[in-house]
Amino acid sequence: MRRRELLAALATQPLVVPLLDRLAAVAAIPPGRGSSRVRPGDPDWPSPAEWDGLRQRVGGRLIAVESPLQPCREAPIGEACRTLFRELKNPYYIGDEVGLTQTTGWVDAWTLEQSVFAVAAESAADVAAAVDFAREHNLRLVVRGGGHSYLGTSNSRDSLLIWTRRMAGIELHDAFVPADTNAAPLPAVTVGPGAVWGHVYNAVTTKGARLVQGGGCLTVGVAGLVLGGGFGSYSRLYGTAAASLLQAEIVTADGAVQIANAATNPDLFWR
């Protein structure tokens, strides 16, 4: 069902009436109120010198986001476009392109619109630098790992994107103890936020002869699945990926790099 057909059907239902009243009230808010983000063309949009300052802070890893689909806009039947569509059948190719996502919105709920710039983060310090820059300049900030967000949060126009694809390290531990806890040592794996489950299973199960609870789609990002709860093929036996989490290194909205576990920053941890 297309979006307009869905809206037409909903318009016949009583539930829509108070919703429309609320939307009308929101639309009536005078300009200048609310928490509108700075966008390209606004007077407060960062200058080229300010963007260059961010580029230097992240070691040159600030990139302008361009759509890989541009060749098809310029020459829909050209060889470059045909080659691109062959590549689009490969989900790993899509994952390696900052300007693409693995999913699109249901019933036209959202469409792929590229961010203006992306920080190709390689460390928590890079992430913190992007968070600080977005906060200081009141920019919309989005994060993309595997690019599978069904809610459209892997991309946003007029935004700064934190791209974690390069933070894909995987390290196995025979006896891991979360920081500042007296927990018993457990076999565990430390996984970067840009890793996808296919790579994790290869390291943990194929090479390490162990099991980690994850999802069924091999190209889904680890961080996104865990933050979404993490239901997987063996959840009836071993629970969700989120319930298996022992500790996380996080960057909070103030740009601070912190550890979150059951003892340290427990308010940021869901165990």
Task: Go through each PLM region and give its residues.
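N-terminal accessory segments
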Residues: 2-239, 244, 258-261, 268-269
